[in-house]
Each structure stands twice: as C-alpha cells, then as structure tokens.
C-alpha cells in the first residue's frame, strides 16, 4: 500500500480469506455483491476505532449488484453567463475564452515525496500543491447549492462547443466540490485532444460497446482525426474518468476547463498542443449548449458529515476561489 512503517494500520477482516477450502471460499465470494464502493477514503476509522485523517479507511460504503448502478440518471448542468451551471440551457448565450497553456501551472500538484509515506501516508505527511489557475488560463462554471445529497457513481462527460485559434487544442476538464465551509475538494479529471473529437457510432471501438452520453467513446483513429475549423465552433465531448463521490447538501459542483497539467500528483503530459499557447473559446447558448453530464444515483445517502479538509486520499482540498471568466462578443 506504500504506507510508511510509522503509520499503524489495521486492515478489516477479509470475509473470504479465512475459509479453509477453495470451493467454500469461491462460493462465499460469489455470494458477495458484485460492486462494493468505499466512499470518502481517508475519512473513516480503523476496525479498532482509531482514526487519523488520511488513513486508508472509508467514511462509509455501499454495495450494488452491477455497474452502471441500476437506476443511474444522466444529470445535466448547462454552462451559463457569469460562470454558473444551470438546469436548462441559458436563455441568453455567450462566449468565454482562456489562454491555453499547459505550463500555466506546475506540471504536477504534489511535492517531491511521492514514495513510501508522503503521498501514500496519512494527511499529516501530505504536501499537496493544488493551485488555482492563473487569471485568464481557465474558465470555470459552478452550480447553485445542492438541495439534497447527490451521489455520483461512474463516468461522465463535459460537452463543449469550442473554437480554437490554432488547428488543435488539448482540453482538460476538472470536476470539484465547492463546500459550504469555503473549501474545494478535487474529484476527477478528463482530457481530450480536440482533433480526436469524433465519437464512435457503433461498438467497433476500443471498449467494444456503444458510446453514450455518460460514456462517450472517441474512435481515436487517424482517419477520423480532424483539425479544428478556423473561426468556427464545433462540439467537443471530453470523457470523464470514473468517480464515486457524494456531493453533500449545500455544496456546489464546479467544472473547470483549461489546458492539461497541474491536477495530478506524480505524472503530467509532456507533449501538448498548442505549443506554447493559443486561445480556446467556449460557447454556451440554446443552439450550442455546453454542459456537464454526471451519473447520479438516486436514493444513495451520505450518512456521515463533510470529511475533514484534508483527509480524502488523492482528493486534495484547498480554499475555494472564484474565477472571473474572460468574455467575448
């Protein structure tokens, strides 16, 4: 697990490991739910009751029969004026833009100690450096405070209407939770090179399944790669990696669009475009509805309070700071 020897960790009892025969162990394993989700990893207590923020224990867990979770809804929030996310496409459209520069932030968001301990220890050893994007290098959109706990399980997407000053542009989407206490928690990322925006229309793709609103699948073939048209907006869907996160009542959901880098602890993209920089514009309107789509699972409660900041493993938190988006006519 990469834990330092100074961190005393007691693992929970394995329900299968102590069964003496293979057949009996297999039968017991097959009786377990197929999907087990550990929420708020780092915010829980050990089997002995001890609790140190960042230790590898979940705040709570839930089990399900399959993934995607039955009953999952594709919940859409639309980009709007003044950096808001709304429930419907905005009545009045607009354009925001940012300078696309993959070196606007440090390439990674952690300190130098990423081996045993440090990143993998408890929160007292962390050296997160998750920084806010410099002015003009990102655009951001934030929802209204949530009226109920909103549990998101699975992949998602950010549907963007993009215009680029260069023939190609790399896009990074960052999803975070803006808490009522003024802190912001990182949740997940997604990336796409805009020239590779063509989505698969059948199951003949790398995942061998159909592309959906919650799991868009680019073809990633050379034949389908296409430069960005000069002076025109085109739809670019950025797939999001999986998340299992409860956005608690009163929190706001934030999506930030920027060039890649600055949001992962130990790796970054060494080859990015444009190089060194360009201008990416994002449109939002009735006819060009840029949006965030997340897989919301109804009826999944969050029985614990907000986790301490910091405490979640590989989900750094920081004081929230609003971004004033650049606007264009």
Predicted region positions:
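C-terminal, loop-rich substrate-recognition/catalytic regions characterized by aromatic stacking residues
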Residues: 1-329
């Amino acid at each position: 697990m990469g834990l330092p020897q100074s961190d005393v960790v007691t693992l929970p009892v394995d329900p299968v490991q102590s069964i003496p025969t293979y057949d009996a162990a297999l039968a017991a394993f097959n009786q377990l739910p197929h999907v087990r989700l550990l929420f708020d990893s780092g915010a829980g207590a050990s089997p002995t009751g001890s609790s140190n923020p960042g230790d590898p224990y979940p705040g709570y867990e839930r089990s399900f029969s399959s993934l995607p979770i039955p009953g999952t809804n594709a919940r859409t929030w639309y980009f709007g004026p003044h950096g808001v996310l709304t429930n419907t496409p905005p009545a009045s459209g607009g354009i925001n833009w940012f300078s696309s520069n993959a070196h606007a932030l440090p390439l990674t968001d952690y300190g130098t100690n990423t081996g045993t301990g440090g990143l993998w220890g408890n929160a007292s050893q962390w050296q997160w450096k998750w920084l806010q994007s410099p002015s003009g290098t990102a655009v951001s959109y934030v929802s209204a405070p949530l009226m109920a706990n909103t549990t998101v399980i699975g992949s998602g997407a950010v549907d963007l209407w993009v215009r680029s000053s260069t023939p190609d542009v790399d896009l990074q989407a960052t999803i975070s939770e803006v808490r009522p206490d003024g802190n912001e928690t990182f949740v997940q990322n997604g990336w796409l090179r805009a020239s590779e925006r063509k989505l698969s229309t059948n199951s003949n793709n790398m995942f061998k399944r159909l592309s959906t609103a919650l799991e868009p699948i680019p073809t990633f073939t050379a034949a389908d790669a296409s430069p960005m048209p000069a002076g025109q907006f085109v739809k670019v869907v950025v797939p999001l990696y999986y998340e299992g996160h409860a956005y608690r009542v009163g929190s706001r959901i934030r999506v930030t669009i920027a060039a890649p880098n600055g949001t992962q602890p130990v790796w970054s993209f060494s080859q990015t475009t444009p190089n060194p920089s360009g201008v990416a514009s994002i449109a939002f309107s009735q006819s060009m509805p840029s949006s965030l789509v997340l897989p919301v699972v109804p009826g999944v409660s969050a029985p614990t309070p907000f986790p301490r900041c910091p405490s979640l493993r590989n989900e750094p938190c920081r004081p929230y700071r609003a971004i004033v988006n650049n606007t264009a006519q």
